[in-house]
A protein has these predicted regions:
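Active-site and donor-binding regions of nucleotide-sugar-utilizing enzymes
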Residues: 1-133
């Protein structure tokens, strides 16, 4: 399962998925996708467009979508039990998802890590606890 939260993550995710499919065309990869990931062999469970917003009004308006996406992805982790959870940036959302995956013993790879120095130093402890590879 792969989760992105913004356009730049979508571009990185699309390159990552393409590279994986070159190694193993039979892989099933699913999660949150933007337009670029949707053009790859990727099963989009939720659109990144519903998660993003630039201003306060958009963020407040998207709160319901963010909550729906989080619940959907938690259920997906529980039901489908992916071999790996791949996270790309979007730290406030993705670290919570990493914590849940870890409780299910699903390995977590943070492919594009959050910027620790710019935001919260306490994130280092969360990452150390919930992320297997970075």
């Amino acid at each position: 399962m792969l989760v992105v939260g913004e356009a730049s993550g979508d571009a990185h995710g699309a390159q990552f998925v393409d590279a994986l499919h070159k190694r193993d065309a039979g892989l099933t990869i699913y999660g949150v996708a933007g337009e670029q990931l949707k053009r790859t062999q990727f099963e989009a469970l939720f659109s990144v467009a519903k998660l993003t917003g630039m201003g306060l009004v958009e963020l407040v308006g998207n709160a319901g979508n963010v909550w729906r996406a989080y619940r959907l992805l938690k259920r997906t982790l529980e039901q489908r039990r992916p071999n790996l959870l791949v996270l790309i940036d979007f730290p406030d959302f993705n670290l919570r998802l990493a914590k849940h995956a870890k409780s299910l013993r699903i390995p977590v790879l943070y492919y594009v890590s959050p910027q620790i120095w710019a935001w919260r130093r306490g994130r280092v402890r969360q990452i150390a606890r919930w992320v297997d590879h970075m």
